[in-house]
């Protein structure tokens, strides 16, 4: 692994090149896949394809499955979310048993959102290629792994061969330097980035996040960042592994031990972009300029600081952006020129693969403590996994939420997407810690505003959007 192999390479190029199995002239290279994560929604047809051709799962020990999208967060009853959900979950149980794949089902203590359980169990390691039939697989890039979402036909290909054809992407460096102010989180950083690049600014690229503000983030913050790389159109997001990464991983169930751990860390330290590496695109931000962010429109790029006014469509010079803003304002039932702090909410959702880890729940609980959810607001807190739920309860966070009037739920994807019982009714407005604010994402006619966990809790206790910096407990 000498320097000569890696001269002038970005982290992405190192990861990509290390996994090429075969590359013929004028053909898309074939990459080896180290880890394959599976859930109940995008896998049934893939397993059916294997069965029809009489193929086994090539390396079942590198494949892990869980139930998350369809599950009820109020009961562990497989029938609770409707017939389609029941069928998909039962199919996953059958397929995993038949093909020898490890499954974290509803009764398993590790069950949870696939992009939460992978890292917390140490399945996600630096230097790996990781795929899942889910667009937010980019989350795992926080560990310096090349992780991206795939379609169901590709799920079948990986199950059958442990490989995937994958073309080279362009490279983008997003550098955030300086220190963020009090109350500013990774969610605010990534929303500010998407606000600058636009929701298609990263199209065709793999993004590497770097700079002193990124290095200062915990692994949980870095996961939030990489989770939303897809929301700027990127194929994947990356953060170079460092001591923060290694300290997080050490001792986790699937992490290496002993001499293998030492060898792993020695290799992982080489996984960074060379000083002379060239990126196709470079974006820079000053961390000190970032305020708490709230989306106002129907894509994550339509975002402003909480203390700014909702923009008028005429303020956009690009005609496509102007038309998009007009449509978004109409759908969201918002008027240009008003402050977001004047906008009342109906529901609050704290959860999702973006923000349902223990640090997210601690940040929200710090705001909720000693306060009450505003009259007429329904607020739910959905931990990302069984271990997150257990840790939160050991710390007494569940009691803080319940006392404040929040609902404390079981793990699952929940209100991030309208595939289970947690959804918005037409016209309802939600402060959500999830990653997508598209029309109907949380339920037909629902209006989604993306915020950090602390900002979501602030909205819950205020009844409208509020600057978390104005609430004294935000100095947790």
Swiss-Prot record:
Record's protein name: 3-isopropylmalate dehydratase large subunit
Assigned protein family: Belongs to the aconitase/IPM isomerase family. LeuC type 1 subfamily.
Top-rank taxon, per record: Bacteria
Source organism of the structure: Yersinia enterocolitica serotype O:8 / biotype 1B (strain NCTC 13174 / 8081)
NCBIfam families to which the protein is assigned, alphabetical: leuC (TIGR00170), PRK05478.1 (NF004016), PRK12466.1 (NF009116)
Reactions listed under catalytic activity: (2R,3S)-3-isopropylmalate = (2S)-2-isopropylmalate
Reported function: Catalyzes the isomerization between 2-isopropylmalate and 3-isopropylmalate, via the formation of 2-isopropylmaleate.
EC annotation from Swiss-Prot or TrEMBL: 4.2.1.33
Cofactor note: Binds 1 [4Fe-4S] cluster per subunit.
GO biological process, any: L-leucine biosynthetic process
């Amino acid at each position: 692994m000498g320097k000569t192999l890696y001269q002038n390479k970005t982290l992405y190029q190192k990861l990509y090149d290390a996994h090429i199995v075969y590359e013929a002239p004028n053909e898309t290279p074939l990459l080896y896949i180290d880890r394959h994560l599976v859930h109940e929604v995008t896998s049934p047809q893939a397993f059916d394809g294997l069965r029809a051709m009489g193929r086994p799962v090539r390396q079942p020990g590198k494949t892990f499955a869980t139930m998350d999208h369809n599950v009820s967060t109020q009961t562990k009853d497989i029938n609770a979310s409707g017939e389609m959900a029941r069928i998909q979950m039962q199919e996953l149980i059958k397929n995993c048993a038949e093909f020898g794949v490890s499954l974290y089902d509803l009764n398993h203590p590790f069950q949870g959102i696939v992009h939460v359980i992978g890292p917390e169990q140490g399945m996600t390691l630096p230097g790996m290629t990781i795929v899942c039939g889910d667009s937010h697989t980019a989350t795992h890039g926080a560990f310096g792994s090349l992780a991206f979402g795939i379609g169901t036909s590709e799920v079948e290909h990986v199950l059958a061969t442990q490989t995937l054809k994958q073309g080279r992407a362009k490279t983008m460096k997003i550098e955030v330097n300086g220190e963020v102010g009090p109350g500013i989180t990774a969610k605010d950083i990534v929303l500010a980035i998407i606000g600058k690049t636009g929701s298609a600014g990263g199209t065709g690229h793999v993004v590497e996040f770097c700079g002193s503000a990124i290095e200062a983030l915990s692994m949980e913050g870095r996961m939030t960042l990489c989770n939303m790389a897809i929301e700027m159109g990127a194929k994947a997001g990356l953060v170079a592994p460092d001591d923060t990464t290694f300290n997080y991983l050490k001792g986790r169930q699937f992490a290496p031990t002993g001499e293998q751990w030492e060898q792993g860390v020695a290799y992982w330290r080489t996984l960074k972009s060379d000083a002379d590496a060239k990126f196709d695109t470079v974006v820079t931000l000053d961390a000190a300029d970032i305020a708490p962010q709230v989306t106002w429109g129907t894509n994550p790029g339509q975002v402003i600081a909480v203390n700014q006014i909702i923009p008028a469509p005429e303020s956009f010079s690009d005609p496509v952006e102007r038309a998009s803003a007009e449509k978004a304002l109409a759908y969201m039932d918002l008027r240009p020129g008003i402050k977001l702090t004047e906008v009342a909410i109906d529901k609050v959702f704290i959860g999702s693969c973006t923000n349902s880890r223990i640090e997210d729940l601690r940040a929200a609980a710090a705001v909720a403590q000693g306060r009450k959810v505003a009259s007429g607001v329904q607020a739910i807190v959905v931990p990302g996994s069984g271990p997150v739920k257990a840790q939160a309860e050991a710390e007494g966070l569940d009691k803080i939420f319940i006392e404040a009037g929040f609902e404390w739920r079981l793990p699952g994807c929940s209100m991030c997407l309208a595939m289970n019982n947690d959804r918005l009714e037409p016209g309802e407005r939600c402060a959500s810690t999830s990653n997508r604010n598209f029309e109907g994402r949380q339920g037909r006619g629902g209006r989604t505003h993306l915020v950090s966990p602390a900002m979501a809790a602030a909205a819950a206790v205020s009844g409208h959007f509020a600057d978390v910096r104005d609430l004294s407990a935000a100095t947790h």
